[in-house]
């Protein structure tokens, strides 16, 4: 058993007790820094990362670690299958550093609409139901696709079953999502989801 410490965007530290073997899903794992925190606390981690440059490092980092399963896929709330993943506009400078900014949201203000790769997307609610194991923590940092995803997790009933859900929202970089993000915040509050934190990072 270990303690996982996550810093929230108000600089407070949230401590989560992780029992050995409990499951965590890391959506938007990038090169695995948060994945590593969960794994070090004793969790089994399922890490999703669609960006090929970040995934190469992620996979190499955990290739001999049986507690971490890495998938070169993104997660969505609807329309699974192939989608365009747009690269950060500064991707040409450093493909790893700027891999954190890649997004399936074409209107994100720091992506290059002409530079993208086709990536496989899975519907997370369906994945979790088929996985059929208790999930202790769900971390979501998927550059704008979190609105669609989280609404589907709530619609499907999956969100009620996960004790800790941490989400980074991106309405500052995607102004078109401001109303949807506000609606999501209101829904989380009005429907009494105390397990969903929309202020992570």
Give the location of each predicted region.
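Phosphate/nucleotide-binding beta-alpha loop and adjacent structural elements of enzyme active sites
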Residues: 1-201
């Amino acid at each position: 058993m270990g303690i996982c410490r996550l810093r929230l965007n108000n600089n407070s530290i949230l401590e989560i007790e992780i029992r050995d073997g409990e499951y965590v899903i890391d959506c938007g794992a990038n090169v695995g820094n948060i994945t590593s925190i969960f794994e070090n606390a004793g969790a089994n981690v399922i890490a999703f990362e669609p960006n090929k440059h970040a995934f190469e490092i992620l996979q190499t980092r955990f290739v001999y670690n049986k507690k971490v399963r890495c998938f070169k896929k993104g997660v969505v709330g609807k329309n699974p299958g192939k989608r365009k993943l747009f690269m950060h506009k500064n991707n040409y400078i450093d493909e790893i550093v700027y891999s954190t900014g890649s997004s399936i949201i074409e209107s994100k203000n720091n992506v290059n609409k002409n530079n993208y790769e086709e990536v496989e997307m899975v519907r997370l609610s369906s994945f979790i139901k088929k996985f059929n194991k208790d999930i202790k923590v769900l971390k979501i940092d998927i550059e704008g696709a979190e609105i669609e995803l989280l609404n589907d997790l709530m619609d499907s009933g999956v969100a009620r079953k996960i004790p800790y859900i941490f989400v980074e929202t991106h309405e500052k970089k995607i102004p078109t999502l401001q109303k949807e993000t506000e609606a999501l915040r209101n829904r989380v509050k009005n429907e009494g989801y105390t397990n969903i934190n929309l202020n992570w990072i």
